[in-house]
Swiss-Prot record:
Modified residues (N-acetylalanine): A2
Organism from which the protein derives: Mus musculus
rRNA-binding is among the record's keywords: no
PTM annotation (Phosphoserine): residues: S3, S12
Swiss-Prot/TrEMBL GO biological process terms: cell division; endoplasmic reticulum to Golgi vesicle-mediated transport; establishment of mitotic spindle orientation; Golgi organization; mitotic metaphase chromosome alignment; mitotic sister chromatid segregation; mitotic spindle assembly checkpoint signaling; protein localization to kinetochore
Gene3D superfamilies on file: 1.10.357.150
Protein name: Centromere/kinetochore protein zw10 homolog
Location in or out of the cell: Cytoplasm; Endoplasmic reticulum membrane; Chromosome, Centromere, Kinetochore; Cytoplasm, Cytoskeleton, Spindle
Region Interaction with RINT1, residue ranges: 2-317
Subunit text: Interacts with NBAS and KNTC1/ROD; the interactions are mutually exclusive and indicative for its association in two different vesicle tethering complexes. Component of the RZZ complex composed of KNTC1/ROD, ZW10 and ZWILCH. Component of the NRZ complex composed of NBAS, ZW10 and RINT1/TIP20L; NRZ associates with SNAREs STX18, USE1L, BNIP1/SEC20L and SEC22B (the assembly has been described as syntaxin 18 complex). Interacts directly with RINT1/TIP20L bound to BNIP1/SEC20L. Interacts with C19orf25 and ZWINT. Interacts with ZFYVE1.
GO CC terms in record: cytosol; Dsl1/NZR complex; endoplasmic reticulum; endoplasmic reticulum membrane; kinetochore; kinetochore microtubule; lipid droplet; nucleus
Keyword Heme (UniProt): no
Family assignment from sequence similarity: Belongs to the ZW10 family.
Length: 779
């Protein structure tokens, strides 16, 4: 201990080495002497029982003095040791850091050496096309580079060079792997750019190499499994399989799904397996789901055996790389697109159009389940039920959606078809509407019981006179053939709803309502110009609207007890649509009537107000205007003949003829001077209208039946009798006019007010006493 302390103190400049050693030696000897004396004293005190109290106290004093000297020396030593210890620690730390730097440099050099060795071994393996060892060596080089990059003190320029070298080598091996992959998996495409046609598909082939070539002049190819494993080690397998999957989907799987006549043919050769196509004649526009599933299954089975089920795990180090499932990787890349293709091109078209065929769809659901089970067994799929099977199982919803879509499309096609193709309807015409099933027997019994309970004590409530059986029938007229089919479509759809599920029934019911909403919006817009320009089409459209409104009155009631319970609470009605359809037809026909009135008035405006008929030019213009008016009315009578119901026809023609007559009367009564010749010619013009006017009333094609309506012209033309009185006045004398006035009780008084009669008398006769007397009688 003394030598260690002395050695430590030797490094201090404040304490001399010899002095310190001497004093320590002296203290040591003194300690030994005192120890002996103390022992001797204790022996004498406790062993010999000598009275040594005084000597003991002296010894205590000496011991205390010695202890103080020791403490001072110890304190001095500690001070010196701490000072030198700090200096030694700093030096030791510097040495340690130097050692660590040397170790890091040594490690970096070792990593560089390993990187270089890995690259050399990689090049050797690549030259021999040993792709798996080459990929592993490249992976080792990449790990070395990662460690080098983790050292912040490493030269950045060198790191950049190493990274570039590694990238170049990786691209090099990927290039060689890609070349061999193209030799192992060979695609053959047609020369044409259009690959979607059937001819192009028939020229598309996929060849998978299964064995090594035996020819000496050919370089042996690596196995597909070694190429795939090398891709996996390099992290490029998912990308490569995804690219292969997209080509497989585009050039093989999708054509098989979309083209029903296309079938896959498997050709097996000693060193390869080929997948090509053949075309078989078929009448189907779209393949059935079971057929499409079988086509895809055949292709996937070949790929499973020749490509997807190859052993890739045998050469992998345990625990380093997880097991590779090629089928699963391929499925992840293409299943979403493949299932969507199957749904859009197969399952959609397999949905029944009639509820009676829904039971047959169970076979398609079963085939879909088997197809999905096969895909899961080959590990192409994983997890729960896919969208494909969910779509197939949700048949009720798809059936309803498709049915509703088909109904709306068919309805719109009918609405946009030609209006002028018509059929005759009437009380005697039985429209081809479907027979409705009877309500449930229980409901009938319940209704009968209620009726009996309510009217047991009632008397005879039958009216004395019964209504005509045709009281609520639609009058005979012509409607568009398309509208008749549209109504049949509505009945058929509601009849379909009676045998469908509740959800489907609700959708079908509201689809029928949508048909009529669509008619209200589409027809007036789509046929706008024709309805405005062609009076016959306007009349047919009027009939169409009235025909639809007529059926809507009872359509809901007919199906009220046959639809789903959810619809039997009062919502099964179409009555709310009736006013809209009546208004739609009426407005269209009234607009046409206004247009015809405008044309009539425009023609009469060229008659020069029927003034100065003694002028040949004026008379010719007036005569021409009258003939044009009659011609227009005859033309309307022909185009509306057998189209409009008789009562509507007569009212319409009567209104137009009345407009023309009223205009002629207003112009003639406004004349201030009518000469005898003018009167004769005006009478002639009016006589033409009076004779030919009734002939425009020809609602029926049978002329003999039209006589009835021609005789009833005054019923439909309110100005007919006043017009006849005007003709009489134009040829009558003052006496005859007075007689027809008959003190305001004659036919003339009924036809004209006194002011107009007086004005006509003043225009027709000169100012004489007889005229004054006649005017005096007109009051």
């Amino acid at each position: 201990m003394a030598s260690f302390v002395t050695e430590v103190l030797a490094h201090s400049g404040s304490l001399e080495k010899e002095d310190l050693g001497t004093r320590i030696s002296r203290l040591t000897r003194r300690v030994e002497e005192i120890k002996g004396e103390v022992c001797n004293m204790i022996s004498k005190k406790y062993s010999e029982f000598l009275p040594t109290m005084q000597s003991a106290q002296a010894l205590v004093t000496q011991v205390d003095t010695l202890s103080n000297d020791i403490d001072q020396l110890k304190s001095r030593i500690e001070t010196e040791v701490c000072r030198d210890l700090h200096i030694s620690t700093v030096e030791f730390t510097n040495l340690k850091q130097q050692l660590e730097r040397d170790s890091v440099v040594l490690t970096l050099l070792k990593q560089l050496q390993e990187f270089s060795s890995a690259i050399e071994e990689y090049n050797s393996a690549l030259a021999e096309k040993k792709y798996i060892p080459a990929a592993r060596h490249l992976e080792e080089a990449q790990e070395c580079l990662k460690l080098l990059k983790s050292r912040k003190c490493f030269d950045l320029k060198m790191l950049k060079s190493l990274s570039m070298e590694l990238t170049v080598q990786k691209q090099n091996i990927l290039y060689h792997l890609g070349e061999d992959w193209q030799k192992l998996v060979v695609w053959k495409f047609p020369p044409a750019k259009d690959t979607s046609s059937l001819e192009s598909c028939l020229q598309t082939e996929l060849h998978l190499c299964t064995e090594q070539p035996e020819k000496e002049d050919m370089t042996p190819l690596p196995s597909i499994s070694s190429v795939l494993l090398a891709f996996s080690i390099l992290g490029e397998l998912p990308t490569k399989l995804k690219s292969f999957g997209q080509m497989l989907l585009k050039y093989i799987l999708k054509p098989l799904v979309t083209c029903p006549s296309l079938h896959a043919v498997i050709e097996r050769q000693p060193s390869s397996v080929s997948i090509c196509f053949e075309s078989l004649t078929t009448d189907l526009e779209h393949p059935s789901p079971p057929e499409a599933f079988a086509k895809i299954r055949l292709v996937l089975e070949v790929l499973q055996k020749q490509l997807l089920d190859l052993p890739l795990d045998a050469d992998l180090e345990i625990g380093k790389v997880p097991g590779i499932v090629l089928a699963e990787m391929l499925g992840e890349g293409i299943w979403e697109d493949l299932s969507e293709c199957l749904i859009r091109n197969c399952l959609v078209y397999s949905i029944p159009t009639n509820s009676s065929k829904l039971q047959e769809y169970e076979e398609i659901i079963q085939s879909t389940e088997e197809f999905e089970k096969f895909l899961k067994e080959m590990r192409f799929l994983k997890g729960d039920t896919t969208d494909l099977l969910k779509y197939a199982r949700n048949i009720n919803s798809h059936f309803a959606n498709k049915k509703c879509q088909d109904v709306i499309v068919a309805a719109r096609n009918l609405m946009t078809s030609e209006i002028h193709n018509t059929v005759k309807i009437g009380p005697d015409c039985k429209e081809a509407l479907p027979d409705l099933p009877s309500p449930d027997a229980d409901h009938k019994l319940q209704v009968q019981t209620v009726c009996k309970a309510q009217f047991t004590d009632a008397g005879n409530l039958e009216p004395e006179t019964s209504l005509d059986p045709q009281s609520f029938s639609l009058p005979t007229c012509r409607i568009s053939e398309a509208v008749k089919k549209l109504m049949e479509l509505a009945y058929q759809t509601l009849l379909e709803a009676t045998t469908s599920s509740d959800q489907c029934a609700v959708q079908l019911f509201y689809s029928v309502r949508n048909i009529f909403h669509l008619f209200h919006d589409v027809v007036p817009t789509y046929h706008k110009e024709n309805l405005r320009k062609l009076p016959q089409l306007a009349a047919i459209h009027h009939n169409n609207c009235m025909y639809i409104a007529h059926h809507l009155l009872t359509l809901g009631h007919q199906f009220r007890l046959r639809l789903a319970p959810i619809l039997c609470d009062g919502t099964t009605t179409f009555v709310d649509l009736v006013p809209g359809f009546r208004r739609l037809g009426t407005e269209c026909f009234l607009a046409q009537m206004q247009a015809q009135k405008g044309e009539l008035l425009e023609r009469l405006s060229s008659a020069r107000s029927f003034a100065n008929m003694d002028d040949e030019e004026n008379y010719s213009a007036a005569s021409k205007a009258v003939r044009q008016v009659l011609h227009q009315l005859r033309r309307l009578g022909i185009v509306w003949q057998d189209v409009l119901p008789v009562n509507i026809y007569c009212k319409a023609m009567g209104t137009l003829l009345n407009t023309a007559i009223a205009e002629m009367m207003s112009r003639i009564t406004a004349l201030e001077d009518i000469s005898t010749e003018d009167g004769d010619r005006l009478y002639s013009l009016c006589k033409t209208v009076m004779d030919e006017g009734p002939q425009v009333f020809a609602p029926l094609s049978d002329e003999n039946k039209n006589k009835k309506y021609q005789e009833e012209v005054p019923v439909y033309v309110s100005k007919w009798m006043p017009f006849k009185e005007l003709m009489i006045m134009l040829q009558a004398s003052l006496q005859e006019i007075g007689d027809r006035w008959a003190d305001g009780k004659g036919p003339l008084a009924t036809a004209f007010p006194s002011s107009e009669v007086k004005a006509l008398i003043r225009a027709l006769f000169q100012n004489t006493e007889r005229r004054a007397a006649a005017l005096a009688k007109i009051k």
